[in-house]
Amino acid sequence: MCIVKTLHLITHVMKEYNSQFTEGSDFSLIEEQILEFWKENNIFKKSIENRDEKRRFVFYDGPPFANGLPHYGHLLTGFIKDTVARYKTMAGFRVDRRFGWDCHGLPAEMLAEKELGVSGKLAIEEFGIEKFNNYCRNSVMKFSREWKQYIDRQSRWVDFENDYKTMNLSFMESIMWSFYQLWQKGLIYESIKIVPYSWACQTPLSNFETRIDNAYRQKTSKTVTLAFELLDAPKSLIVDNITAYKILVWTTTPWTLPCNLALAISPNIKYCGAIINKEMYIFSRAYLKNFEDHCKKNNIEYLIHSDDICYLSLEYLSYKPVFNYFIDIKNAFKVLVADFVVEDEGTGIVHMAPGFGEDDFILCKKQGIPDIDDKDTSKLLATICPIDDGGKFTERISDFVNMHVFDTNDQIISILKAKNLCFKTDQYLHNYPHCWRTDTPLIYRAMSSWYVEVTKIKNRMIDLNKDVNWIPSHIRSGQFGKWLENAKDWAISRNRFWGTPLPVWKSDNPNYPRIDVYGSIKKVFDDIKALEEDFDIPIDDLHRPYIDNLVRPNPDDPTGKSMMRRVTDVFDCWFESGSMPYAQLHYPFENKELFENYFPADFITEYVAQTRGWFYTLFVLSTALFDKPPFKNCICHGVVLDTQGQKLSKRLNNYADPMEIFKQYGSDAMRFLMLSHTVSYGGDLLLDKDGVMVRDVIRNVIKPMWNSYNFFTIYADIDKVSARVISDLDEVDNIMDKYIMCECISTIQSIFNAMEEFDQSVGNYGYNIKAACNSIVQFFEVLNNWYIRRCRSRFWSSEITKDKVNAYNTLYTVMYYMVKVSAPFLPAITEAIWQKLNFQEEESVHLSLLPNIEHITLKDEDQKNIQYMKLIINICGCVLSIRNVRNIRVRQPLNKITIYSYNNNNDLFNLPVKYQNILLDEINVKSIVFKSNIEDIASFQLKLNFPELGKRIPEKMKNLISLLKSNQWKVLENGQLMLGIREGEYYILEDNEYTLNLKVHSEFASTITLGPNLLGVLVLDNTLTDELIMEGIARDIVRIIQQSRKDNKFNVSDKIDVVICTQDKMVKNSVQAWYEYIVQQTLSLSLVIHENLDANNVAEYCKTTMKDRNLTLFIKKL
């Protein structure tokens, strides 16, 4: 049984004292007072300025969009950022926490379109780009005040005064510089490619934008299997009386059929020919069963002519187009051969629409389809991709002009049926990419875009990724590593309005081609082109349309007629956020030394999907520009969902307003819930709507910490004791003091290890916030439910003895250390305790340094102390569990426990007397008996793991079964299990090849374990004598009096009179025998017992009853 579970059991069974100190504690109000204290005293500012500028810890705060309110995901990220920043600050580092805002891009434009009532690029251009962008500029920070309120209330320290915005001129100039550098390195090119396209936003997306935020979701599409009629019969298939040869093609996008320009078959597929009504249908051999099933279902007679048709028989055959919109295109409407065609789905033959498929585009381009010069970009795109920005067909597709492509599917299928070309239709459920902003299904279309040639630097990115400490560690070679291995060139241009413009000017006359790329506004560097130098005009805004007005003659045109005009695209906003490490500092124009000395960042965190978003774009640009990874350590946290695993949304009404949670419970509880959960380590948090999980943190974490502080102050104030911090363990001689001090030092070290050391079990260096939180929880469990409870009598004694002072000093010392080390994880409540305990150190706990325990060395004796104490805590848990199950009151003393040692365990046999005494007192038992013959009370049951044994010694399986049945096995002194006997054939089994279960033969027995190790078995003697019963009654009376004191709100130091009325002889005898014990425990100055009592004599007393003993008890405060 683990220590924490044991202590929970002790707390539950003993009905511990904690509750008396927590009633009325308003942690939310306490937090608000602390927030005000930090603000009034500039504690955050001091926490930065008090640290050495040359000893920096750098973390990047990813810029959010400020046009919506923060959600729980933002809070989680913020809690992790703030915790690490506070921890490193207390470790002595200077941690700047500059906040940033993502201002450009689709989120801002979509909001502006909605609020302005304009939709689409043409409408925006008619409205006016200048007016539209000005609206975006003014609305993009719409919720910045609310963001600040949320962040402040979550006790997160952020520098808003020096925030950066991606729309600032300085930030945008650094983006210009980075693009110029990429251009100079040969990593930028313009090309026509098939890209994911949001027709709702009227812009292309990056390939990674289709992989974030669950962009893929199920969609039902109407599919069609249609027949393309060959113009010539395949020579190997010529048969008399065949009137037509048709190729069957399956497609999930019927709307692309009007743009069909070719068909593709595979050299690796065998094809079939089947005859229906004198027409031969050709399809892959793998499709034959589907073909036959369809024919049988619809009573269609067919004859299989051949199932071994070679692709060579079909290559370059011409076919009749289904639609005549491209009848004039040379080289079109032929059967082409391509390796990408597979037979897993469909007919093994694919229709090619080069404007709407990547493979289609590449294959047709190789074949010169269409026969248009690549340089004539506009004509090529208008031909192969005849749709407008909104996804509607243009005039070329005359039958469907101005119809959205998705709306044409049914009409196209109807036309196919009318032409007798439709073989079958189906509904097809598949995962399909959707726009991350509008939730509309994307299309893939040909567009001219500007690209970063990521494939050129992919291998270097893979190498640099090995130097990053990912948390969790599997991200390195898993989610992020695999993404890098499959990295594609990045389309960074967007044909939108509100964003940093691409600094590219092109000649408007293709006869005099020229491209100018600019890297700065003013001429700062000799080798970087500057806008003001070439255009001879001051520039104070790079946004459209002002930047578009910069036009100059083409220097390469001797006629002087052509002009240099800027390409109209703006940057993908992911390029902007990926540039924040240097752009926030206006590098290289300012802060050059600061950036170069502290790049890459020490730490970064966001949720795990950013491996395909911000983390990725940071990595691309950092590798390309600086040949370095952008960060050294990265936490990829998980996602906050509702209890059903659904995304939190207003529509589902499945989450509580975070500010209401903060108002009711405070933010520390929410912080610790998230930090201590696997969500801080990549898992998902299923958060209830009613705040139950947050309340649990109050009860299990914050209250225990507060209780320990409260316990100290109550009794220290009564005794007027000024405690001090113990600096040397040698000063401590009390066994309980020594234990809790050692446990404190061990806990601090475990937190340091979790946050800073390499952990082989999880494969990363530090930043294990969950483990650090668990250490804090476990310590305060031990402090409250073991140390303080076991030492209450020392604090309650009436005299100020040396032992009492030592107890105060010990509790004060561990609170001093633990408040410090817990401060990053519970910043507000630890600050409150720090202020109240007046440690006479720094003004704030967050200005102090983490505990320095290097000078404190735990000796072997100290380690043994911890081991023995944990052992007796476990034994206590076992005994209390038996009492609980067998309904034996804890206050009822018992005669003895017998402990049977397993394998002569020395920890049990050598348990010192002083620990035995603590154990006996705790479990309320009179004596311990140790025995070694465990077989008298328990037996082992061996179960072999045959699959594992079969891997190692498969030929011995019969022998093993025989030995097991004959019970020929034993555990050796070294802990290994031997099957067989040494004189004959025997086998030493590995740990994973068997399980050994111990079965006890008494209902009053329990196994004793420490960690994974079996130590022995204990048996509780439940025999009761009159003496034991009377002592139990005395303890019950003490409990009733204490409960009555609490119910009547007496102070813990109040003296009382007690009157007991009962006719129970056993109760009378008990009171007489245990009189001194009862009055001492309850601070009673008198205790009188009566058989009958006049109510008038106790009119001023508080009354309570003990029903199972027919006892009435009266107390009065003196």
Swiss-Prot record:
InterPro entries per UniProt: aa-tRNA-synth_I_CS, aa-tRNA-synth_Ia, Anticodon_Ile_ABEc, Ile-tRNA-ligase, Ile-tRNA-ligase_type2, M/V/L/I-tRNA-synth_anticd-bd, Rossmann-like_a/b/a_fold, tRNAsynth_Ia_anticodon-bd
Residue numbers covered by motif 'HIGH' region: 64-74
EC assignment: 6.1.1.5
Protein name: Isoleucine--tRNA ligase
CDD domains: Anticodon_Ia_Ile_ABEc, IleRS_core
Chain segments annotated as coiled-coil in the UniProt record: none
Keywords noted in UniProt: Aminoacyl-tRNA synthetase, ATP-binding, Cytoplasm, Ligase, Metal-binding, Nucleotide-binding, Protein biosynthesis, Zinc
